[in-house]
A protein has these predicted regions:
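N-terminal beta-propeller domains
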Residues: 1-86, 141-149, 297-374, 455-469
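Beta-sheet repeat architectures centered on beta-propellers
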Residues: 2-68, 393-396, 403-407, 414, ...
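Small/polar beta-strand repeat architecture
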Residues: 4-8, 130, 186, 190-218, ...
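Trp- and S/T/G-rich repeat-edge/linker motifs of beta-rich repeat architectures
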Residues: 40-59, 78-98, 120-152, 193-202, ...
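Conserved positions at the start
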Residues: 62, 100, 107, 302, ...
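Short hydrophobic/aromatic-rich beta-strand motifs
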Residues: 71-73, 108-112, 162-188, 218-225, ...
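Short loop/turn segments that connect beta-strands within the blades of beta-propeller domains
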Residues: 75-77, 106, 113-115, 183, ...
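Short, surface-exposed terminal/edge motifs of secreted or surface/virion proteins that either
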Residues: 78-81, 116-132, 169-201, 233-236, ...
Length: 632
């Protein structure tokens, strides 16, 4: 009898030296971990615990923070600014309302919405973006004038000029003597040098209002309301948006096209009545004033703001309009003079509310949950809006938007996305999608090529918050203990707020990096590997497992094993009392089909390698059935 040759299962030894990251899916391998806290890929291919953080100062009631030449924190109603150059801290009390803020930088100023104020990092001042003046108990005078705000008093009115005029004499030449003050008349001035009459253009209105000149500047766009000019027959369209062309000591000069039967006159409007007087003072009229005169430089209500090409762009979840301020001027949002520096506004046709705004690759981007709107161009005349139906920013996740290495990362209803200028791609396939959905808040930050994402699914509920870290260079996810209800990236540092204090993610990057005050002494960590033993179909068992660990400081490690999905059994522990030491932890597990490994402890460790000794088995590790019935 001849027996067939059968390949013998040999003993083998494998060494795992390249470790992955967090994988919450079914396909979690032995080089990854299915659950864990406070590990990072900073020493890849080894697996190390994160760096200790440093507590900078106690901080409560934080409504937002932003970095621009220093760190600005909005605490309750107060603004606190700490310059990077070590200058004196600036505090502005009762500067804003006690509510969550949307912050954006432009030049040296940090704009704060919805309060519509600006904090100047250069001088520490706070100023309002908008302005409003009301004639409460005051009289306002309206008079036609030239571009420089000058008014004129004619010495005569008629169809023909006087025969012997004096040099500089003013005359009003009319077309209809029954309506001498109508707008189609011509105001002229005589020049003795040339012997000719020259027409004076009165295409502007001088508004004399005490205190108004202090609130507005030249080239501001001001909304004028409540005037009796139309009822007086002086201007048809004075009420509305007007450009301020000149500002004097007590008046403003705005553009207003001549109109009406009583154009050539002065209108003085009081609380409940207005009086019109002709330019030569020969005729007066009384008109009822139903409203109070108001001058306002408007700023739209914006929920999401971003800066792109020296303009602040914004949108609101309550309307389908995208706004851009005047070039370099965040105080003017409705300036339409037909020049390249004009403001800009466009209505979009997509359904749903806006959920976020950001700037990336030179584009101003506006998101809805299922749409991306991209604006490109250099001036209003060539701005172009393109729309893409894709996975956009999830509701309540506007602050998850973060640009890192020329790529925009954000939380969508389907997971974490990356946009590099084309189509968003999902980068969170290894994470549990159900734990990324229906968030109450999401905040993003960046440091050293790592994207930090804080997620809160149920406000105020313990255990429903996570701090996920994505290594964008290696495509690995990790999770850290929650210390980031709010974040602010500086490019070289990441500041985190845990609800009670402000922390620095990397203490070595602080100006006083030598100080150890506030630095975490012990970092708690935990790691659960994927199933070990799924990489081969032969009947072999794990006879020996050796862990190679490095301790960067005094640390403790507890090792536990779970056989075939059973309970955890502690099999080894390690106490490292010296820094910069390497340790080998040999483990001899009992026979099993699959095995999971758990590391738990405090300190700073690095998992360098994992060595597996596999031995041949005689069967029985995995249930075998000789007969199987297949149904198609």
């Amino acid at each position: 009898m001849v027996l067939a040759n059968r390949t013998r299962v040999q003993n083998s030894r494998t060494l795992l030296r390249a470790f992955g990251g967090l994988n919450e899916g079914y396909g979690c391998s032995e080089a990854e971990y299915s659950a864990g806290i406070n590990f990072s890929s900073r020493d890849f291919p080894a697996l190390s615990t994160r760096k200790p953080r440093r507590k900078l100062r106690t901080l409560t009631g934080l409504n937002g923070m932003y970095h621009l030449n220093g760190l600005l924190t909005v605490c309750g109603k107060d603004l606190v600014y700490t310059p990077d150059d070590g200058g004196e801290t600036v505090t502005c009390t009762d500067a804003v309302a006690d509510s969550k803020k949307a912050l954006v930088g432009l030049g040296t100023k940090i704009l704060i919405f919805p309060d519509k104020v600006a904090f100047d990092t250069a001088d520490g001042s706070v100023s309002a973006l908008g302005a409003c003046w009301k004639a409460e108990g005051q009289s306002v005078e309206f008079a036609p004038c030239d571009a420089e705000g000058r008014t004129y008093t004619p010495t005569g009115v008629g169809r023909e000029e006087p025969e012997s005029p004096a040099d500089g004499q003013i005359f009003l030449k009319v077309e209809d003597e029954e309506h001498p003050w109508r707008y189609d008349g011509t105001l002229e001035v005589y020049s003795a040098a040339s012997g000719n009459w020259t027409a004076l253009s009165l295409d502007y209105c001088r508004i004399t209002a005490a205190g108004a000149q202090e609130k507005f500047c030249q080239w501001d766009t001001v909304t004028v309301q409540g005037t009796a000019a139309k009822q007086a027959g002086q201007w048809e369209a004075l009420d509305g948006d007007c450009v301020v062309y000149a500002v004097t000591e007590n008046s403003l000069c705005v553009r207003a096209d001549p109109a009406g039967d009583y154009f050539y006159g002065t209108l003085v409007q009081g609380t409940d009545a207005a009086q019109w007087t002709s330019l030569d003072g020969s005729q007066t009229r009384s008109i009822a004033a139903e409203q109070t005169v108001q001058l306002e430089r408007r700023v739209p209500d914006l929920d999401f703001v971003t800066e792109c090409d020296n303009r602040v762009w914004g949108c609101s979840s309550r309307e389908n309009v995208i706004y851009a301020c005047k070039l370099g001027d965040p105080t003017n949002w409705f300036s339409y003079r037909g020049i390249a520096a004009d403001s800009y506004a466009v209505t979009v046709g997509s359904d749903g509310a806006f959920t976020g705004a950001a700037t990336c690759m030179g584009y101003a981007l506006f998101f809805k949950e299922n749409t991306l709107h991209k604006l490109c161009g250099t001036k209003p005349s060539d701005f172009q809006l393109t729309s893409l139906r894709c996975r956009g920013v999830a509701k309540n996740a506007a602050r998850s938007l973060c640009v890192l290495n020329e790529t925009l990362y954000y939380l969508s209803p389907d997971g974490v996305m990356a946009w590099d200028g084309s189509i968003p791609t999902k980068v969170s396939a290894v994470l549990d999608a159900s734990r990324l959905a229906n968030v109450q808040s999401a905040v993003g930050g960046a440091l050293d090529g790592r994207y930090y994402l804080h997620i809160s699914r149920t406000a105020g509920t313990q255990g429903q918050t996570r701090l996920l870290v994505y290594d964008t260079e290696r495509g690995l996810w990790h999770e850290e203990d929650v210390c980031s209800c709010d974040m602010a990236s500086t490019g070289g540092q990441l500041y985190l707020w845990d609800g009670q204090a402000l922390w620095a993610a990397d203490p070595s990057r602080e100006s006083d990096w030598q100080s150890t005050e506030g630095v975490e002494q012990q970092v708690s960590f935990e790691l659960v590997t994927g199933d070990i033993g799924q990489d081969g179909a032969e009947q072999r068992y794990l006879s020996r497992l050796t862990l190679r660990l490095d301790a960067a400081c005094a640390s403790t490690v507890e090792v536990a094993l779970s056989y075939d999905g059973g309970p955890w059994e502690t099999v080894a522990s390690l106490t490292a009392r010296e820094a910069r030491r390497s340790y080998d932890l040999p483990l001899v597990p009992r026979r099993h089909s699959t095995l999971r490994l758990r590391l738990r402890g405090k300190g700073q460790i690095t998992l360098r390698s994992l060595a597996k000794n596999l031995a041949a088995a005689k069967g029985g590790l995995v249930e075998e059935r000789e007969e199987a019935t297949w149904q198609v």
